[in-house]
Design a protein with these regions (language model features):
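Divalent metal-coordination and catalytic microenvironments
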Residues: 6, 25, 42, 53, ...
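C-terminal cap of metal-dependent C-N hydrolases
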Residues: 364-420
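His/Asp/Glu-enriched, well-ordered alpha-helical/loop segment
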Residues: 245-248, 252, 292-374, 388-390
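Histidine-centered catalytic micro-motifs
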Residues: 47-59, 216-223
Length: 424
């Protein structure tokens, strides 16, 4: 298959008149300055976007949690109520619709941070991985790749209190129970199996290091000040420092959020992947993290829509810059190129897909066409489109060489109808 793009993001810049040749789902030729040829992709063509942090079932909360004042902790109770209702069939139905929404937004790969494992009282299903398999199948039907980040979740607090209520669905009893279940999961061409430490609240210190050898490995880090305070009270150090002592920080480890950090924490994270989720961090009143300081320390930034208050990686990308402006009262912290790299190449790398995220020969053929003629993007410099475009401007999406979104519609199913069905 051959595509032609008037504008395409190649080698960190906008190239003109680019012919893109694809064989067996990979780029075999990328030719800027080419004569017109192949199927035309309109607007600006980007590499596929990587959503590095997702909780698919949180999508059911969108627009339903704003009726009163509150905090992350009051929101969590509403989230637990949703978690208590799902089974493998309803989870598949919801996740398929959510991943379809991601495809419409130009996302070709998702990191699903998965901790909703068992039945309502904590009893495993006949297939102990039925919930995880539902997510993998949902991504396959939506046409996107998935890294299932199966989470260790053993305690309800840093003090080691047992799981209670709906949390019993999340736990496997101990590390060995979790490892036995996860080791039964199998990767496939469109799915990788990774690991997750839910947080220092949910994983005892002596277990942290036992998970460290698994990759990719993701974990929630210092999203709330209360987590830091509880960790210092229990262990005499910050969560970042505790994880460092336990050997968790490895090249393929990703810290998610990293909102409330000390200078020492930032230095430790300088060699890590860090996934930022600005729209969720705003929605839950988490705070503004030190994105520029982390990047300057050497952290490799990626992006996630997390709770799916919105599913729009353009909004996440510019949110990183705009939040820095609010915090510092200055402009110009991140270039468009840095933000697009976070949304593409480093996001894919954090999920274990090193052969995706850039338009280059040999890479997976993922393409996202973004309209430059909408009311949002008309007149913009293509190089700065990330500061204007939204998910609604995505017109075409190619994932592993297959067209999954054509003129704004999913080629496999009606996504709005699927969402209505899943959320009724």
């Amino acid at each position: 298959m051959t595509y032609f793009a008037e504008y395409a993001w190649v080698d960190g810049a906008v190239a003109r008149d680019v012919r893109l040749e694809i064989t067996d789902g990979r780029f075999t030729a990328v030719t800027p300055g080419a004569a017109t040829g192949g199927a035309r992709l309109p607007g600006l063509v980007l590499p596929g976007l990587a959503n590095a942090h997702s909780h698919a079932f949180h999508r059911a909360l969108r627009g339903r949690t704003h009726g009163d004042r509150g905090s992350f902790w009051t929101w969590r109770e509403q989230m637990y109520a949703v978690a208590g209702r799902l089974d493998p069939d309803s989870y598949f139905t919801l996740a398929r619709a959510v991943y379809g929404e991601m495809a419409l937004a130009g996302i070709t790969c998702v990191g699903e941070f998965h901790y909703l494992h068992h039945g309502p009282d904590g009893t495993p299903y006949a297939d102990p991985n039925a919930m995880g398999q539902a997510l993998i199948e949902a991504a396959r039907e939506a046409g996107i790749r998935i890294t299932l980040l199966d989470a260790v979740y053993l305690t309800s607090s840093v003090d080691g209190n047992p799981l209670e209520g709906v949390q019993r669905r999340f736990g496997d009893g101990d590390y060995d129970g979790w490892a036995e279940r996860v080791d039964a999961l199998r990767a496939s061409p469109g799915a990788k199996i990774g690991a997750a430490l839910h947080s220092v609240r949910a994983v005892p210190a002596h277990v942290l290091g036992r998970v460290a050898g698994r990759a990719p490995l993701h974990l929630h880090l210092s999203e709330q000040r209360a987590e830091n305070e509880q960790c210092r009270a229990a262990h005499g150090c910050s969560p970042t420092e505790l994880l460092d002592k336990m050997g968790v920080w490895q090249p393929e480890t990703t810290a998610v959020h990293a909102t409330h950090l000390s200078p020492t924490d930032r230095d430790i994270l300088g060699g890590q992947h860090v996934c930022l989720c600005p729209t969720t961090e705003r929605d839950l009143a988490d705070g503004i993290g030190p994105a520029r300081a982390l990047a300057d320390a050497g952290a490799r930034l990626s992006l996630g829509s997390d709770s799916h208050a919105v599913i729009d990686l353009f909004e996440e990308a510019r949110g990183v810059e705009l939040d820095e402006r609010l915090a510092t009262e200055k402009r110009g912290h991140f270039t468009a190129g840095e933000l697009l790299t976070a949304a593409t190449a480093t996001g894919h790398a954090s999920l274990g897909w090193d052969d995706a995220g850039s338009i280059a020969v040999g890479n997976r053929a993922d393409l996202v066409a973004v309209s430059l003629g909408s009311v949002r993007t008309a007149g913009v410099d293509p190089a700065g489109a990330v500061f204007a475009a939204t998910a609604a401007d995505v017109t075409h999406v190619v994932a592993d060489g297959r067209l999954i979104v054509d003129d704004g519609r999913h080629t496999a199913f009606d996504v709005p109808a699927a969402l209505r069905e899943a959320l009724r």
